[in-house]
Amino acid sequence: MPYQIHRYPAELIDVISLTYGERVVVRPVLPQDRELMVAFFHGLSADARCNRFMHPVSEPSSELLRQFTQVDYTSHVALVAEVFLDGRETVIGEARYVRAADASLAEVSLSVAELWQGKGLAKLMLTKLERHATAAGVRRLFSETLATNQKVLSLAVKAGFVIAESADKDGVMRLEKTLGPRNHIHRCADCGFVVDDGAGRS
């Protein structure tokens, strides 16, 4: 089936400031970001790739890159964080949610380059996804991660996720969060797509 995009959500484009004042562009991913995503994955350590996919991945497959860059923005919403290093556009983080068969439920995942961790980027991207998901009618987010992935588990606790052992997968933790009511999210002509009145904010 040919790739089709429902509507590119330009309102999700943002410039954010991290803990130490670094400015980062966050925007929805595009099909032409394929090579940027390849470079991003190559920059992750073997452990980081294993944590992201829950199994060893040495090289992203063509199918994986297709899934990561050809996003319809209806059932699948994906963001990249980028900076310019030595004059070159460089992806330093990615975050996404994919709706389940029950459209009120979505799986969320993210990864951040090691040199950019601990600066608040993961939390900012997760918050942006949560707000968009709430406005789109998603009621619950979930994710799975290895029990040894302390960075993600720590982020999940701070973001208000409930953590429990997976019922059917050894060494795997399941993370779940109920989002706030949709009526707490409204459009704002001056500041983009959504404003959070407080519900669902961790």
Segments and roles (model prediction):
Residues 1-202:
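Long, contiguous binding/interaction regions
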